[in-house]
Amino acid sequence: RRHIFLGRWMKHGVYPVKLLRLFRYGAARCEQRHMDEHMELSRGRSVEFEYDFVDENLNDLGWWAHKHVDYSSREAADIEDILSSSAAASGIDGQAGRKRAARQPLFWRSFAYFCYRYFLKLGFLDGREGFLWHFMQGWWYRTLVDARQFEKQKKGSANTER
C-alpha cells in the first residue's frame, strides 16, 4: 500500500505495507479483532502485484483525527484482549510481535514506535508531511490508545477499592 498524506507519498517509515486483497472464496480468514483486522491465507499461495495501490484520503486533518479518536477505543479493546490470559492462551491473532508490543509499558511503546518509524526507518526523509504523518499516526494515535487503556485501568482499580 502506498500512503499519500497531505499530498505526499510516505516513502519511509512504514512503506511498503503488504496486504492480502484477492483470494479464492474460503481460502482466507479474517482475524477476530475490533480494529485493524487482516486477512490470513489458509490455503493456496500468494502472489505480489508489481505495483502498489494508492491510499490517499482527501479529507482534511480534522476528519482524520476524529476518525482516529474513534479507532483508539477499538484498538484499546484489542490490546485488552491480547493481554487477557484467555486471548494469549488461544493465540488470538497469531502475531507474536503484536503481543510483545501490547506488553510494553504504557506510553513508552508509542514513543518507541515513533522513534523507530521516524528515525530508524528514515521517516524524516518525507519532509514536514512525513513528520506530521509519523507523529500523528505513530505517536499521537498510539498514545491515545494507551491513554484509553490507562483510563480503563484507573476505572477498574477505583471500582475494586470501593
Identify the residue ranges that each predicted region occupies.
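Catalytic-site signature of metal-activated, phosphate-bearing donor transferases
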Residues: 1-153, 159
